[in-house]
């Protein structure tokens, strides 16, 4: 976050005044309190639930509030295989989320269709349905990988001008 410290004109003014833009402050707050929607499609959802458990504890980063409704969430973690029958529902959930909203594609099935990519009923990547901000590769990715993806998204939200390599 870009913070500018100015020398006070009056020595009576305390030195703990920080000047910044409203957008920078809002992005800083948003990056430290993602509210993911509870949404798992396959095996990767088990690893996503494990990341919320006591061993990995994503609560220490402020991301523990899994919301039951997309209208209360700002992050969708697509964890697992997206089928053609499920694709319109994924799109609808994304559209119901309030802005600003972000998407993490978790696992090789969500990223590219995984081992089922040649199937007639599997979508070859969730990025064909909704815009994806961060990709977390693996089959199934470990909870540490999801935490790494959340931290990468945090950097992207704090400084939106920096493009991350997908």
Curated annotation (Swiss-Prot):
Its EC number is 7.1.1.-. GO terms for cellular component: plasma membrane; respiratory chain complex I. The keyword Ribonucleoprotein does not apply. Keywords: 4Fe-4S, Cell membrane, Iron, Iron-sulfur, Membrane, Metal-binding, NAD, Quinone, Translocase, Transport. [4Fe-4S] cluster binds at residues 43-44, 109, 139. It catalyses: a quinone + NADH + 5 H(+)(in) = a quinol + NAD(+) + 4 H(+)(out). PANTHER family: NADH DEHYDROGENASE (PTHR11995), NADH DEHYDROGENASE [UBIQUINONE] IRON-SULFUR PROTEIN 7, MITOCHONDRIAL (PTHR11995:SF14). This is NADH-quinone oxidoreductase subunit B. It comes from Moorella thermoacetica (strain ATCC 39073 / JCM 9320).
């Amino acid at each position: 976050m870009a913070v500018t410290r100015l020398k006070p004109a009056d020595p009576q003014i305390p030195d703990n005044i920080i000047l910044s833009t409203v957008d920078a402050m809002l992005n800083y707050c948003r990056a430290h309190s993602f509210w993911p929607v509870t949404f798992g499609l396959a095996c990767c959802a088990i690893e996503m639930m494990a990341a919320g458990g006591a061993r990995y504890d994503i609560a220490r980063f402020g991301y523990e509030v899994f919301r039951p409704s997309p209208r209360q969430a700002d992050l969708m973690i697509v964890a697992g295989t997206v089928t053609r029958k499920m694709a319109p529902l994924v799109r609808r959930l994304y559209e119901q989320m309030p802005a600003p909203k972000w998407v993490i594609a978790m696992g090789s099935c969500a990223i590219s269709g995984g081992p089922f990519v040649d199937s007639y009923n599997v979508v070859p990547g969730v990025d064909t349905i909704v815009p994806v901000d961060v990709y977390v590769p693996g089959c199934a990715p470990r909870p540490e990988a999801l935490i790494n993806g959340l931290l990468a998204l945090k950097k992207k939200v704090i400084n939106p001008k920096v493009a991350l390599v997908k």
